[in-house]
């Protein structure tokens, strides 16, 4: 399966920069998936979870508050105001990532009625990591 280049950027720096088999994004009209050779598009993203399927078939999740994505045949660039990668090499690192994600959820809770879905996805991602 072909790979695509993925970058997730915030004003504070790079959250993810690497290759992926597929990316699922929380679009304004609903979730959508991107594979290599996808048609070009630029669209808005809502608060939600970006799922990144890596070459080894593992999935990494990144919680975002909102942003914009540019897709072309070989690359996906995601610009977001705030993001937390749900990953870590130890239980304490995962716990810190989950705490950061919960703080991000609290900051967007009043602005987005779909926050229950985001919370459920976050809890699911947490279970997969522990």
Curated annotation (Swiss-Prot):
It comes from the Bacteria. It is found in: Cell inner membrane. GO terms for cellular component: plasma membrane; proton-transporting ATP synthase complex. The keyword Nucleus does not apply. It is a peripheral membrane protein. Pfam families: ATP-synt_DE_N. SUPFAM superfamilies: Epsilon subunit of F1F0-ATP synthase N-terminal domain (SSF51344). Keywords: ATP synthesis, Cell inner membrane, Cell membrane, CF(1), Hydrogen ion transport, Ion transport, Membrane, Transport. GO terms for molecular function: ATP binding; proton-transporting ATP synthase activity, rotational mechanism. F-type ATPases have 2 components, CF(1) - the catalytic core - and CF(0) - the membrane proton channel. CF(1) has five subunits: alpha(3), beta(3), gamma(1), delta(1), epsilon(1). CF(0) has three main subunits: a, b and c. PANTHER family: ATP SYNTHASE DELTA/EPSILON CHAIN, ATP SYNTHASE EPSILON CHAIN, CHLOROPLASTIC. Belongs to the ATPase epsilon chain family. Produces ATP from ADP in the presence of a proton gradient across the membrane. This is ATP synthase epsilon chain. It comes from Sulfurimonas denitrificans (strain ATCC 33889 / DSM 1251) (Thiomicrospira denitrificans (strain ATCC 33889 / DSM 1251)).
């Amino acid at each position: 399966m072909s790979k695509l280049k993925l970058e997730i950027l915030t004003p504070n720096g790079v959250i993810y920069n690497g290759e992926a088999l597929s990316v699922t994004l929380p679009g304004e009209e609903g979730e959508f998936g991107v594979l290599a050779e996808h048609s070009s598009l630029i669209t808005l993203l809502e608060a939600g979870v970006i799922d990144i399927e890596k070459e080894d078939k593992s999935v990494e999740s990144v919680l975002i508050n909102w942003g914009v994505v540019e897709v072309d045949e070989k690359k996906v660039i995601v610009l977001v105001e705030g993001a937390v990668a749900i990953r870590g090499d130890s239980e304490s690192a995962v716990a810190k990532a989950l705490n950061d994600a919960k703080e991000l959820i609290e900051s967007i809770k009043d602005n987005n009625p779909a926050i229950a879905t985001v919370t459920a996805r976050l809890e699911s991602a947490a279970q997969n990591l522990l």
